[in-house]
Amino acid sequence: MRFPGFILRLAALAGSGLLCLLSAGGQATTNRFSFDDYLLVPVRIHLLLAKDSPAIQTTLTSADITRILGKMNGVWAQAGLHFYLESLVREDAREADPQPEGPSDRDGLLGLRPSQSSASNMFHLYYVKQMSVNGICFPEAIFVKDTASLRKVEGGIDEPIPRVSSHELGHALGLPHRQNTTNLMASGTTGTWLNDEEISQTRETARGFAWVESASSLMEKANALFRANKRPEAATLYSRLATIPLKAEQVELAKKRAGLAKRMDSSSPAK
């Protein structure tokens, strides 16, 4: 089951000020990257269901995903990377594992993925209830358990799931573990910091994906659609820009126009 209106609702919340995008530690922070520096990365989030396998079925909701993604983007703002929600999919796991601790190997986890929701032009993030580690990154998909727990460190994030998700995305962007306790790539801690070398590496890796776009390029496309009076299509692109945690004229315009398109759509007579 997909949530087609969920992404536009995210943009509307951002425009109203109800969606709070904070830094990893829950505090507003300055950002050395400008709007034009930002790279936008699509992620499809999968909430896996398995009524006969409690170890698999996640209990996360769309409201949880709004919060989690906001905190993830607070972490990744230090690298000028923004993960936008391509879609949120709630779906039955393909091969539910009856083990009480959940699947623990590569085949067991990858076997949970329904084939109809896979695609090659984005990152895929799957949430389950239990597995032997907090999270794991495969070339095909990332898995995170919604019961993750971490060791607190000074200045660390205030919630495990956004940190584990951000850590695994770090692996997807080419980063190895680095056992500095306050670093995002340290194992099992709440740390979120990246050094300059890691920031450069993740940005270089992201640029290598054909499906990663610069904020300026996406804004140009959205504006062209808006001028052509293709408001729903424009709103889809504006919604990706509207949640960038940055005080910038372009972000404010994206919020305004995404919200405008949603209001126009809701006021249109039913077809």
Model-assigned labels for residue ranges:
Residues 31-33, 152-218:
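The catalytic-center signature of Zn2+-dependent metalloproteases
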Residues 11-21:
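Bacterial N-terminal signal peptides
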Residues 1-7:
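N-terminal secretory signal peptides that target proteins for export/translocation
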Residues 27-120, 131, 238, 245-246:
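Propeptide-to-catalytic entry region of secreted or membrane-anchored zinc metalloproteases
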Residues 45, 85, 124-127, 143-144, ...:
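Structural recognition of the beta-strand scaffold that forms the well-ordered cores
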Residues 72-80, 168-169, 173-177, 189, ...:
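Sec/Tat-exported extracytoplasmic proteins
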Residues 33-35, 112-178:
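Active-site-proximal segment of zinc-dependent metalloprotease catalytic domains
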